[in-house]
Amino acid sequence: MSKKTGTKTSKSGSKKSNKDVEKLVDDEDIQDLSDKKNKISQSKNLVKNNKSSKNSKSSKSVKSTKTSTKTSLKKQVKTPPKKQTKTSSKKNKKDESDDDVTDNSDISDDDNTGNSDISDDENDQEEDNDISSDEEETETRQKSSGKKGNVNKDVGSSRKLKTDKNARNDNKVLEIRTTQTGALKQVFERVSGVISDCCLTFMPADKDINNAGDDNEYYEDESTKSSHKQSKTTDRPKNTGGIRIIRLTEDNNTLVKVVLEAANFEYFRCDEPKITVGVDMHTLHSHLKMINDDDPIVIYMKKDIQGSLYIRSLSENNDNSEEREIELFLMDIINPEIPVPKTEFQNRITMKSDKFHLICKHLSQNSTFVEITSINNEILFKGQSEGGKVTMTYKDTGYKKKEKPDQVIQGVYELRNLLGFSKCNKLCNTIEIYLKNDFPLVLVISVATLGKMYVFLSPIDNGN
């Protein structure tokens, strides 16, 4: 019994001890767990503190970098941002991560976010620098473009001035353009019929040149003399410029004067007050034959080659276009000035140019000289040869009768010279004849719309 009770007590005691042990074990586990919880909470607090410190550091670094970039922009110094902050921040982050044992994953994530924030801020700084540099470049470009624009304006104006100067400095001292080529050809042909060589004088308008008042001279009869006295004194003739020819024939029986006004040409330019050139009229006429009457021509002289006169023509047809350039070698000719005084004639007759040509042509076949008699509006042409006499009469229908009694004007002239200048039907429709006793006969022929040609024919005594 004692044995049984002892075993029972031992068993009960062992049971009690086991329970106590279990209780002790449970208490130890609870303490361990609480300790672990405390450690975990401490580690979390450390992590939070680290995060806050890192965020404050990053914000401070961002603010400092922004202020530094602003000051650098103000100073306009283009310096790239330094990368030392990155390396230092990375080192600090590595040290802090090494010190913290727990929650390494969270800390590394926070480090990555911090690095990304800093890198973003630095990228923003670089973008700001790039933007500022771009703005500076655009400003400089605008300034340079503005300068270039002003320079281009100056260049454009200078080019215009140069073109205007080139119009005057084109190596030409004389330039004349006209479309009335046929009229010029007729004038030179008529002059070459009686004169072998002569001087051509080119003058600009409104210049004081000797005998300038003779350019606009006119001839009138005695009946209209009194009505024009006041106009002569008040309206002084001016030099209209243009082309002048005045020349005596070799026998001194005929004087030819041509006045072509500058304003009647399409373009007339003469850089000198007076240019006089000697020309062989036969050569000039033969060269002009190669040019059509309808082709426009340009007459010019070069500054460096004043021994030649150039004539250029351009003919444009539907089929083709042809251009001709003639260089006429000039001659040294003495050109004596021959004054032509204004004269009041006794009578003036206006005839149709073709009628005048037919009369001279028919009379020249049977006679060498012609006797011209004028009474009022009638003019008589008489020719005599060994076979007989021929008289042809023409009446001026537009003649105005004079108040004075009838006057008879009579003179004998050489038919050859009259016939040469009677071929003027291509120049004008009518011809004017001025007559006066014991004075040269004057023919006034209009040269289309360019000017006039005056022919003075001296009378022959007793028909010899």
From Swiss-Prot:
Entry superkingdom: Viruses
UniProt keyword DNA-binding, yes or no: yes
Record keywords: DNA replication, DNA-binding
Residue spans of biased composition, Basic residues class: 72-92
Biological processes per GO annotation: leading strand elongation; regulation of DNA replication
Any one GO molecular function term: DNA binding
UniProt-annotated stretches for the region Disordered: 1-168, 210-239
Segments of skewed composition (Low complexity): 41-71
Sequence ranges of Acidic residues compositional bias: 97-138
PANTHER family (UniProt xref): PROLIFERATING CELL NUCLEAR ANTIGEN
Membership in a protein family: Belongs to the PCNA family.
Function as written in the Swiss-Prot or TrEMBL entry: Sliding clamp subunit. Responsible for tethering the catalytic subunit of DNA polymerase to DNA during high-speed replication.
Protein name as it appears in the record: Probable DNA polymerase sliding clamp
Organism name: Acanthamoeba polyphaga mimivirus
Gene name tied to this protein: PCNA
